[in-house]
Amino acid sequence: MKVTKISAITIFVKNMKDSCMFYSSIPKFEISYGGPDSNFTTFKISQSPDMYLNIESLSSKRKIENTCRIIFHTEDVDALYYYLRNDDIISNLGKFETKPRDADWGERYFQMYDPDGYEIVFATPID
């Protein structure tokens, strides 16, 4: 028996509207449940295999620790980087940490942060 995929990741956000705008601006991230006026929103990222990102409104009693890194594989990391850099919503609400670069572990990747400071990595395996 083995784990074969990540089905969903849930992160807690301070502002659901900003987070919905941010994640909706990433190509192929589609809201399948909830939305900007909801306390819980699910984005369907992939159908084969099914993969989801959940964002949940942070209650005033809970503190964000920003201890999560989300790594998404993409078909073309460079094209996605330039697309996101030129997207007004992503550029205004997110923060880019690196440009695309090759890593020793066999991926080309870039890092950025979402509106709540969660680290997001987009990567493409290097052939």
Residue ranges and their predicted role:
Residues 1-20, 70, 124-127:
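N-terminal beta-strand motif that seeds the catalytic metal site of vicinal oxygen chelate
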Residues 13-16, 70-116:
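Vicinal oxygen chelate
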Residues 25-32, 88-91:
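Conserved acetyl-CoA-binding loop of GNAT-fold acetyltransferases
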Residues 30-66, 119-124:
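Conserved short beta-strand elements that form part of the metal-binding/catalytic scaffold
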Residues 2-5, 62-67, 103-104:
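Short glycine-enriched loop/turn motifs at secondary-structure junctions
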Residues 16, 36-37, 47-48, 105, ...:
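Short strand-connecting beta-turns/loops that link adjacent beta-strands
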Residues 17-26, 110, 119:
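Conserved active-site alpha-helix within GNAT-family acetyltransferase domains
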